[in-house]
Amino acid sequence: MESIIEIKDLSFRFQADQEHYDVHNITFHVKRGEWLSIVGHNGSGKSTTVRLIDGLLEAESGEIWIDGDCLTPENVWEKRRKIGMVFQNPDNQFVGATVEDDVAFGLENQGIPLEEMEVRVTEALSLVGMAEFSKKEPARLSGGQKQRVAIAGVVALRPDILILDEATSMLDPEGRLELIKIVQKIRQNHHMTVISITHDLDEVAMSDRVLVMKKGEVESTSAPRELFSRSDLDQIGLDQPFVNQLKQSLRDNGLKLPEHYLTEEELEEALWELF
């Protein structure tokens, strides 16, 4: 599978005279159509990295390749059209008086004809389950509903890449899971590439690969299953999955269970075999 994003020896610091780099000499790629989660403690460089990819920040050194072209000041606006970004706080993203106005805002800026705009707004709101709220004021929505509208606004623009910068962190567990499932559906229906910065285990589990950042550098990349087998998850800003905690408790009480990570279904099967 070809890469839609390639990062090569990328470095950045917010102040030219500061000693440490916020992002230092990182190299990684994102395959077209995959879901890549980026995890790590606060201050590890996650958000800075995606802002460099989106052209919101300019790298001090290194290269960013998007869909076969190296990102430059001359093509940054063109490449930014390929990327949609949803941030942590949806209230900071609303500009329209109604839900449908807000989703239409980006389309108006791109000069999309009115008829096509109406179709795209309707499709995007239906996709995130918010069509019945199209005439509502955004301020009257719940946190989860606001994030759905924010995602609809991005989807309506039909980008190739969707970046979620801790977009589920302010939601309750049920709201987070609903939003993750919506993103997965969008990804499958539109063949979209997803990059998510997250501390949420369900979000990580949904991804194809996980990139771990530590002190501005790439510490490792792995499949979620391999990541969850690590004993030092707390050192990279993640909790142990509940199934890991349960399995360890059972092992401590004498049950012979595998050391490697098991899904809930696999743990259930292992317990049935023991009894």
PLM region spans:
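Conserved ABC transporter NBD signature motif
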Residues: G62-C70, K79
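The feature captures the beta-strand-to-loop junction immediately N-terminal to the Walker
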Residues: V39-H41
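Conserved ABC ATPase "signature" region
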Residues: E115-F133
